[in-house]
A protein has these predicted regions:
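A generic structural signal for short hydrophobic patches within well-formed alpha-helices
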Residues: 93, 97-98, 155
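Structural signal for hydrophobic packing residues in well-ordered secondary-structure cores
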Residues: 11, 15, 101, 105, ...
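Hydrophobic helical membrane-anchoring modules
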Residues: 131-139, 143-171
Length: 171
């Protein structure tokens, strides 16, 4: 719920309504499953908390002490602090983004439109628009736990978390 409050506050004081967009990121350690690996878009930002890159990491596992690790394509294991900001695709876009995304989508279709399994990933499109200086995305950070069902075994925890939020009057 705090993610929506963060977005509402940011929209209320948006310094560049045509160009500035928002993304709520979550602390990586608060997005992991204890039942297996996950993939997360790890966000890189500048000193002003503006998004500079979303790097997709796969095969992320929790590690002791709130840390994490991922394995790259060649099998090398890399440590993560757990403090990294993960994109869970909680975006706050101004309407102007859709003209920009439309142009990128046309480029995508001309390059990969005939591939059966090609996908137009919003985080990659946003990174590309940012690199082209068409938009800026301010990263807002939520310290809430993010929960979802990545594995069947996650379901009871998610159900309990939702019940707890309802019982606590949060939802």
């Amino acid at each position: 719920r705090s993610a929506y409050a963060l977005l509402a506050q940011a929209f209320a004081v948006n310094p560049e309504p045509r160009k500035r967009h928002f993304m709520v990121g979550f602390t990586l350690r608060n997005t992991l499953s204890e039942f297996g690996t996950v993939s997360r878009g790890i966000c890189e930002t500048d000193a002003d908390s503006l998004l500079t890159e979303v790097v997709e990491r796969t095969d992320i596992l929790p590690a002791p002490g709130g840390k994490a690790r991922f394995t790259d394509a060649d099998g090398t294991v890399h440590p993560l602090t757990g403090d990294e900001i993960a994109s869970m695709n909680c975006w706050g876009f101004m309407p102007s983004i859709f003209d920009e995304l439309g142009g990128l989508f046309e480029e995508f279709l001309s390059r990969r439109g005939t591939e059966m399994k090609s996908e137009f990933y919003i985080p990659f499109a946003v990174s590309e628009l940012s690199h082209r200086q068409k938009i800026s995305v301010q990263v807002l950070t939520s310290t809430d736990s993010w929960f979802g069902v990545t594995y069947r075994e996650d379901k009871p925890m998610v159900q309990k978390s939702i019940r707890d939020l309802v019982a606590g009057g949060i939802y």
